[in-house]
Amino acid sequence: FNEVIFVKDISMQELKNTATQMRMKVIDMIYKAQSGHPGGSLSAADFVTACYFKYMNLDPKNPRWEDRDRMVLSKGHVCPIQYACLATVGFFPESVLDTLRKEGSMLQGHPSMNRCPGIDISTGSLGQGLACAAGMALAGKLDHKDYKVFCVVGDGEAQEGEIWEAANTAHKYGLDNLIVFVDNNNLQLDGTCD
């Protein structure tokens, strides 16, 4: 791949343009797969893009680097936006995006840490990701590491008790290295999040 340079001083307009490019990649991937969850991927694009292109410390050549920042998609079904970002920053060739949800592909409908470089935790069951992220953040504190853990939670899954238990755990242990984004798109499987 091309050498990746992380532009930490990227402007807001450049981030917006990059998020638009990531959305276009998501639409293309899901269209080619004829399967997927476009809504949640598109609504999470701004903050996932900002994390990967401005805030996260990563090394695409060393995906398991011990001091890297971590990303947890608690709502794992929105992984197409994560895949688009990972490919663009150099974790794997962008041509792999065309294999989304294909048999044998490393890009499945939920992220798999055993298949895809750059995925820090396999997620799928809604409500569990924040607990995993809190555990990673606590491990970082106990190991005296400086990495941050970014977690994307859906507003629908925020109705799960495990989310609130994880939030209480984060507070109890002072996990200031845990950054949580709630994707408040007001949608869930069976309607709105009223």
What feature does the model see in each segment?
Residues 13-17, 190-193:
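Alpha-helix capping and helix-loop boundary segments enriched in small/acidic/polar residues
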Residues 1-7:
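Short, Lys/Arg-enriched N-terminal segments with co-localized hydrophobic residues
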Residues 8-11, 17-20, 24, 44:
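Flexible, compositionally biased loop and terminal segments
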